[in-house]
Regions:
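Single conserved hydrophobic/aromatic residue that forms the stacking wall/gate
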Residues: 1-6, 10
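Outer-membrane beta-barrel proteins
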Residues: 12-14
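GHKL/Histidine-kinase-like ATPase module
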Residues: 18, 26-27, 33, 37-166
Length: 166
């Protein structure tokens, strides 16, 4: 049970529908095929008497998540670059798009929890992205033409990515 001291502190919990909806939408994207329903019994539709309700579902998971994040930007490539692999028994999923902007927008998750401060999975992703794109540029002799040293920051301009480790 709840002690009297706790009930004095936690008299009434107010839930913000927008915050809950945002998190449940995020979880649906992170778990393709999972259907999540949210019903707010505090808000009644005057026309039909129903409660405010929303269903979150994503067939394509991270691919759709990146498209959702990118919906207001101009894309360099319309296709989502998608990787799904397992390393040392740990599933990892990555979805990437590039836009015409200059900033990097990377969302990383471990076990469906947003790792806002990054982590080794994010650092590893950035290193691998830089190494892979730099090798491609060198192999295709693109760097000889520009005569400029390219850094990891250059490859991350306009990048939107979602990384999920489970």
């Amino acid at each position: 049970g709840v002690s009297s001291a706790a009930s004095d502190v936690y008299k009434r919990q107010v839930y913000d529908y927008k915050i809950l909806a945002s998190r449940l939408r995020e979880l649906a994207y992170l778990n393709a095929g999972l259907r999540i329903s949210l019903t707010d019994r505090r808000v009644v539709n005057e026309e039909d008497g129903s409660f405010k309700s929303e269903v979150f579902y994503s067939e394509e998971g991270l691919r759709e998540f990146v498209r959702f994040i990118e919906s207001s930007r101009e894309h360099l490539i319309n296709d989502v670059i998608y990787l799904n692999s397992e390393k040392q028994g740990i599933p990892i999923e990555i979805a990437i798009m590039y836009n015409t902007g200059f900033s990097e927008n990377v969302h990383s998750y471990v076990n469906n929890i947003n790792t806002i401060e990054g982590g080794t999975h994010l650092a590893g992703f950035r290193r691998a992205l830089t190494r892979t794109l730099k090798k491609y540029a060198e192999d295709s002799k693109m760097l000889e033409k520009v005569k400029v040293e390219i850094s990891g920051d250059d490859f991350r301009e306009g990048l939107t990515a979602v990384i999920s480790v489970k």
